[in-house]
Design a protein with these regions (language model features):
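Structured interaction patches on ligand/partner-binding surfaces of diverse proteins
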Residues: 371-396
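Periplasmic OmpA-like peptidoglycan-binding domain that tethers envelope proteins to the cell wall
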Residues: 66, 223, 228-230, 440, ...
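Short, acidic Ser/Thr/Gly-rich low-complexity loop/linker segments typical of extracellular
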Residues: 337-353
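A short, solvent-exposed beta-strand micro-motif common in secreted/extracellular proteins
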Residues: 352, 362-372
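Short, ordered, surface-exposed loop/turn motifs in non-cytosolic proteins
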Residues: 176, 321-337
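Short, solvent-exposed beta-strand/turn patches at coil↔beta or beta↔helix junctions
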Residues: 36, 402-443, 451-459
Length: 518
């Protein structure tokens, strides 16, 4: 039976999911207790679990129906003892985390807050700082307050931070929610929510607790539509195009996941190996959080339930090229084919570490952005990514301080072999440097071309000069004054690595910038 105990705008499910095969694992007393654990939110790297705990004596409002956000971390092959999140979070009677970004530094939480003070229903971000989590700050979503008239509301933020899924009803006091989407705009506001359409939403039944998989295209949600195993089942649908209006027919995940009870809040990490849910069966108290093995350890085996497209989890660190120290920076990743920004992330302000999730099939440029620095971008090519989920570790990003004689590499420049003409996928890197020139009107640079030692000295010197000239001409064509950009070819005279290996030769084939004035 579905419980009627409801958080202010986040579901409480004391009567939760009864999970069947295969391999259901109760997460144990480090996470579960005699109280009700609900609404699991797993970080994309699978290492942090946020969840709600109901009526616990440590909750901000004690044991009378309160709900606070708790978390546990995966350490030494086990979950750590769960801790309650401290102020400025968990100040209200009912608190809920909906999702966390891949970098682990931004939480999407229930309620619209202004400088930490609750205003109304909606959504807010809390961001990690060197001193802990920030006071929550509301997302500006035009039309949401007037559209959301039902009893419930919940949401989910995409891994790239640009898409917000929401479940709510436009009918007053209705419990039959539909799914909506809103998109982040360049000015920091969000678009008016738009319905996912009749292929997903129904008139007489509910669609709720959306979870957008790491591929950015597969949505899992809960619905009480006919044909399910119980009162509510988990369904999935896949986006067909970029309009967010065309979807595959929603399919039930079947008895491997769904039960004869109320099934909701389905969540999976980027690796796609486990699903996290809530169970009422064989629990330590009321509802417990469990995980279900949904991907076989055998690579050739079919998944137990339909899986999203594989992705890569990319991690690294942002450091100052001069000092080697970590930097608190914004991460931007873009499609090198057309220069479009795919998503953003934030480094851990304490360590400079970052994590992003990248869908396969694209060649990406990744860079860090911080005041008074110029980025050395990196490229990550997933166009021919084979197999399933991959981890790409050690993709460190460097920032060059804007100081006289500082030198950096323009990594995402592309030329055909032996040619000096810039290929179109170089534009994003070059446009970024144009922006740096415009933001620093006193900046003067030398663009230096370098080659490996294949070929004659004269040919390499000529090619390096022509490539440096091509970059200079691009900048001038974008409005940068000619006397602010010099170009010089060095040929093979200044190698950074050995020329005895292909990897070393590739490192030596480069275009650098050197700051002459600032």
């Amino acid at each position: 039976m579905k419980s009627t105990l409801i958080a202010f705008s986040c579901f409480l499910f004391p009567t939760a999911i009864v999970l069947a095969q295969p391999k259901v694992e109760n997460l144990g007393n480090a996470i579960n207790s005699e109280y009700n654990e609900i609404n699991p939110v797993i970080s994309p790297d699978g290492k942090t679990l946020y969840f709600g705990r109901v009526s616990h004596p440590q909750n901000a409002h004690g044991q009378e129906g309160s709900q606070d956000i708790w978390f546990s971390e995966w350490q030494n092959s086990q979950w750590s003892l769960a801790k309650r999140m401290t102020p400025p979070l968990n100040k209200e009677e009912y608190n809920c985390a909906y999702s966390v970004t891949p970098d682990g530094n931004t939480l999407l939480i229930m309620g619209a807050y202004d400088r930490g003070a609750y205003e109304t229903r909606g959504f807010s971000f809390s961001k990690r700082t060197v001193n802990g989590w920030s006071a929550p700050s509301k997302l500006n979503i035009p039309g949401l307050e007037g559209m959301s008239k039902g009893e419930y509301m919940c949401g989910f933020l995409s891994n790239d931070g640009k898409t917000l899924l929401m479940a709510f009803s436009e009918k007053k006091r209705s419990t039959k929610d539909d799914l909506y989407v809103s998109f982040l705009q360049k000015n920091g506001t969000w678009t008016k929510p738009q319905s996912l359409g009749v292929e997903v939403n129904t008139d007489d039944f509910t669609e709720t607790t959306p979870f957008l998989a790491s591929d950015g295209a597969t949505i899992y949600f809960s619905s009480d539509r006919p044909g399910g195993q119980g009162s509510n089942d988990i369904y999935y649908t896949k986006r067909i195009d970029k309009t967010w209006k065309r979807w595959s027919k929603p399919a039930n995940l079947g008895p491997a996941i769904n039960t004869d009870g109320y099934d909701a809040y389905y969540a999976i990490a980027a690796a796609g190996d486990y699903a996290y849910m809530v169970s009422k069966k064989n629990t330590l108290g009321k509802g417990d959080i469990v995980r279900i093995k949904i991907k076989s350890d055998e690579p050739s085996a079919a998944p137990i339930v339909p899986a999203p497209d594989p992705v890569a989890l990319v991690s690294g660190k942002v450091v100052d090229t001069k000092t080697g120290k970590p930097i608190d920076a914004r991460i931007i990743y873009e499609n090198l084919a057309d220069g479009t920004e795919v998503g953003t992330a934030q480094t851990d302000p304490r360590t400079g570490e970052y994590k992003i999730v990248l869908p396969k099939g694209v060649k990406y440029g990744v860079r860090a952005v911080a005041k008074d620095f110029i980025a050395e971008a990196q490229s990550i090519d997933l166009t021919n990514m084979k197999g399933g989920f991959q981890e790409v570790n050690g993709t460190n990003l460097t920032l060059v301080p804007i100081e006289i004689n500082a030198v950096g590499v323009l990594n995402n420049l592309f030329f055909d072999t032996g040619k000096a003409a810039l290929r179109p996928e170089s534009n994003a890197e070059l446009d970024r440097m144009v922006l740096t020139f415009n933001e620093n009107p006193g900046l003067v640079m030398e663009i230096g071309g370098h080659t490996d030692n294949v070929g004659t000295d004269a040919a390499n010197l000529k090619l390096s000069q022509e490539r440096a000239d091509s970059v200079r001409e691009y900048f001038i064509g974008k409005g940068i004054e000619p006397d602010r950009v010099q170009s010089k070819g060095y040929g093979e005279a200044k190698p950074k690595a050995t020329n005895d290996t292909e990897e070393g030769r590739q490192t030596n084939r480069r275009v650098e910038f050197k700051i002459l004035k600032k």
